[in-house]
Amino acid sequence: MNANDNVVIVGTGLAGVEVAFGLRASGWEGNIRLVGDATVIPHHLPPLSKAYLAGKATAESLYLRTPDAYAAQNIQLLGGTQVTAINRDRQQVILSDGRALDYDRLVLATGGRPRPLPVASGAVGKANNFRYLRTLEDAECIRRQLIADNRLVVIGGGYIGLEVAATAIKANMHVTLLDTAARVLERVTAPPVSAFYEHLHREAGVDIRTGTQVCGFEMSTDQQKVTAVLCEDGTRLPADLVIAGIGLIPNCELASAAGLQVDNGIVINEHMQTSDPLIMAVGDCARFHSQLYDRWVRIESVPNALEQARKIAAILCGKVPRDEAAPWFWSDQYEIGLKMVGLSEGYDRIIVRGSLAQPDFSVFYLQGDRVLAVDTVNRPVEFNQSKQIITDRLPVEPNLLGDESVPLKEIIAAAKAELSSA
């Protein structure tokens, strides 16, 4: 690297910002330009469905860095600017205002966008009381409409849908949550964990309806507001506010148009490079081969974005990056903290540590004798211990995992001893 090297980062979310500041912290001396179409100061997204929506956080408290930190680190922040094309031959990105920025290294941190509800096109999608939750503007609009005794219909039983439902219940709204799946959190948790969260929400007052498909909407006479949600089973649900959260689509169009390999994300190698070695990708938009799980994955999480950003900074500055860590996720609903580590896909059994009747347990997902993932509810110590089990692939004794008379740290110590003697 030298003082004339140019790094352009496309995307001003967490991944992009962390790459920029990580480069400076690692000794990068060249130019850094951070480009994104958002017009607000880069900010954290997870609190939008939690503290911010509940009115317990301000926009300023969500900033990833203070506004003056960018100039202080000689990072040029180009907000409100869209990158429309990549010219790989000239090593330039083309901006919406016609400018071209030269790069020696290009980092795509383009993130993702909410998966659209197929039946919510036209006037429905433009209605002020029909929203997805991805941006600060979305959260502000929703927060203004969290009015006591009003009727909220949430479409989608994933993390966002459940977190929004919990916040709305606390605002004394009447909440109905619809999910096409047979249970909430079906894609990411085992049936007992889904049952725990369904019970938790129903006890709080949420009307959860699984196996329910939305087929349309009723609109006000002026076509400005949604007045009811229509379901395939004939149910009509009057609504003052509708929020849809049915997944994320990675923003790969820029990469695809530039001829980069795309497959449910921008495909990258172990060095974070795309099919063009001068272009890297990071965060929600990046698909990579996990060494831990020996399969291709795309992970939507804050910890993954942070880890990959640090890896890019280390690689570009000629340093040795850390080994892959187990991915982890979290969700706060009511006063319950759910923390999950690992990827449970492919598990063939679960072991419960604690009682599912109380908000104080861990669920281990196993494939054979290997622990693939762990869900912990209000057990932060076991969560941290579980990260070690999965990252280090420790051969813990499965029969002991459900026995609370044996501390998890002792199970881990025995597994380490077995590894060292092998």
UniProtKB/Swiss-Prot annotation:
One of its GO terms (molecular function) is flavin adenine dinucleotide binding. It catalyses: 2 reduced [2Fe-2S]-[putidaredoxin] + NAD(+) + H(+) = 2 oxidized [2Fe-2S]-[putidaredoxin] + NADH. FAD binds at residues 15, 37, 50, 83, 134, 284, 302. Induction: Induced by camphor and repressed by CamR. It comes from the Bacteria. The keyword Cytoplasm does not apply. Pathway: Terpene metabolism; (R)-camphor degradation. Disulfide bonds: none annotated. GO terms for biological process: (+)-camphor catabolic process. Homodimer or monomer. This is Putidaredoxin reductase CamA. It comes from Pseudomonas putida (Arthrobacter siderocapsulatus). The gene is camA.
